[in-house]
């Protein structure tokens, strides 16, 4: 099980569950000495800490830079993105992270104009080639892909077996059927590229993503499914996702759950919703 948080301090002080496997930090740069010490402490509980590289954030940095200078070229863009990617990758060694989560949403390539498509594919290739170079030198670290497999260019599909986990972007899913559809869309993307006899998309390492309700969301949209329980209450997305995970499928294996912004479990300071969610997947916990 993975959780995503802005920082370790609040999570650690609230004595996060031992059954959580990974914590992913949204802001992995400029870690305080206190946070680094906490990473060591939770590692003693076999809880590992991942840094996050959000590719869209890097592109947004470049777009903000480029809008003020019309003379900048695509070559400049590639150079900037490469430098920023390298700077983010080196954080794993600098701060002693246990691995990296690659957050890459991407875009649908259907109907893209040719020049836009070529730029999209070139930037994607550059980014992931650097990630894979890092992987070769860090085989003992955990590498996680968090994104839409179907938005990867065909030439990048064969890298997926280098990742320990493939997290599906299902935070906005509203029922079990939608989760299943997301899995099959990822698998189908590999089949479309390689044919039915090849499995470019590993089927044994999927993780579903979900999120908690937010206190300011009075309409109960975020963190809830459209379905209701026996008492007529909206099903919590985290618990619905956990119930989906434990339903075995002959076509794929879902190995865990990824919870965004764990600090949103505001109901009490002992992470009650997290506990209930994990208990669904592992009644012994």
PLM region spans:
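Aromatic-lined carbohydrate-recognition surfaces of secreted/lumenal glycan-active proteins
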Residues: 124-154, 172, 199-214
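Glycoside hydrolase catalytic-domain groove-lining segments
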Residues: 37-52, 175-213
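Acidic (Asp/Glu)-rich catalytic clusters
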Residues: 14-17, 33-48, 90-95, 155-161, ...
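Substrate-binding cleft of extracellular glycoside hydrolase catalytic domains
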Residues: 28-123
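Single conserved hydrophobic/aromatic residue that forms the stacking wall/gate
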Residues: 2-8, 12
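Aromatic- and acid-rich polysaccharide-binding/catalytic face
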Residues: 106, 153-182
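Conserved, mostly hydrophobic/aromatic
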Residues: 23, 102, 166, 257
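Substrate-binding cleft of secreted/luminal carbohydrate-active enzymes
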Residues: 204-285
């Amino acid at each position: 099980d993975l959780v995503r948080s802005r920082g370790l301090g609040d999570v650690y002080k609230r004595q996060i569950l031992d059954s959580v496997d990974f914590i992913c930090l949204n802001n992995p740069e400029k870690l305080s000495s206190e946070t680094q010490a906490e990473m060591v402490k939770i590692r003693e509980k076999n809880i590992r800490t991942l840094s996050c590289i959000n590719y869209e954030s890097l592109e947004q940095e470049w777009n903000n830079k480029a809008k003020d200078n019309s003379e900048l070229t695509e070559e400049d863009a590639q150079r900037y993105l490469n430098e920023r990617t390298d700077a983010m990758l080196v954080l794993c060694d600098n701060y002693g992270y246990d691995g990296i989560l690659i957050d890459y949403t991407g875009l649908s390539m259907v109907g893209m104009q040719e020049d836009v498509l070529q730029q999209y594919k070139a930037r994607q290739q550059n980014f992931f080639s650097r990630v894979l170079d890092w992987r070769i030198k860090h085989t003992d670290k955990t590498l996680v892909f968090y994104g839409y497999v179907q938005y990867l260019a065909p030439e990048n599909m064969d890298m997926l077996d280098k990742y320990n986990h493939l997290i599906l972007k299902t935070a906005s899913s509203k029922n079990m059927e939608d989760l299943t559809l997301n899995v099959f869309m990822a698998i189908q993307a590999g089949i479309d590229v390689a044919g039915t006899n090849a499995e470019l998309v590993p089927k044994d390492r999927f993780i579903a993503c979900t999120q908690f309700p937010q206190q300011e969301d009075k309409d109960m949209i975020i963190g809830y499914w459209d379905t209701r329980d026996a008492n007529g209450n909206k099903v919590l997305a985290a618990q619905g996702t956990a119930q989906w995970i434990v339903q075995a499928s002959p076509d794929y294996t879902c190995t865990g759950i990824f919870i965004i912004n764990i600090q949103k479990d505001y109901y009490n300071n002992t992470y009650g919703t997290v506990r209930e969610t994990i208990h669904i997947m592992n009644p012994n916990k």
